[in-house]
Amino acid sequence: ASCGSTTVTAKNLISLAKKQVDYILGENPAKMSYMVGFGERYPQHVHHRGSSLPSVHAHPNPIPCNAGFQYLYSSSPNPNILVGAILGGPDSRDSFSDDRNNYQQSEPATYINAPLVGALAFFAANPVAN
């Protein structure tokens, strides 16, 4: 494939994809994995109701809708680790605010997680490409 006068090979694209996966998993300026539960440093304040509310074992009574805001605005880490979720990640300046109220950066979504699944499937099927 070409991009202007530059030829882009499959090897170039695979290398770029590997760098992007490595970035998501912690090889970035923040030295933080944007996959929750992966590595030594990962986001603690995920914008996800099930992850940020106490479990039914810790809080057996129902939590009414409006009572959930105290958990949204809490500075405490999420009581339930949403292992494997990929968050929105850093902004255009490579800055990341680990703040569950900043949904642009701290919310996991299918359109964020799905592309990584494809890349990881490729690298799992092609270990030599790693």
Swiss-Prot record:
Membrane-traversing stretches: none
Against InterPro entries, the record matches this protein to: 6-hairpin_glycosidase_sf, 6hp_glycosidase-like_sf, Glyco_hydro_9, Glyco_hydro_9_Asp/Glu_AS, Glyco_hydro_9_His_AS
SUPFAM superfamilies from the UniProt entry: Six-hairpin glycosidases
GO function term, MF aspect, one: cellulase activity
Q: What class of enzyme is it?
A: hydrolase
Any GO BP: cellulose catabolic process
| The entry's keywords | Carbohydrate metabolism, Cellulose degradation, Fruit ripening, Glycosidase, Hydrolase, Polysaccharide degradation
Catalysed conversion reaction: Endohydrolysis of (1->4)-beta-D-glucosidic linkages in cellulose, lichenin and cereal beta-D-glucans
Q: EC number(s) per UniProt?
A: 3.2.1.4
Tell me which PROSITE patterns the record gives: GH9_2, GH9_3
For whether the record's keyword set contains Hydrolase, the answer is: yes
Q: Kindly identify the residues recorded as the active site.
A: 47, 98, 107
Entries under Gene3D superfamilies matching the protein: 1.50.10.10
- Protein function: Involved in ripening fruit process.
Family, according to the entry, reads as follows:
Belongs to the glycosyl hydrolase 9 (cellulase E) family.
Its recorded name reads Endoglucanase 2
Q: What is the lineage of its organism?
A: Eukaryota, Viridiplantae, Streptophyta, Embryophyta, Tracheophyta
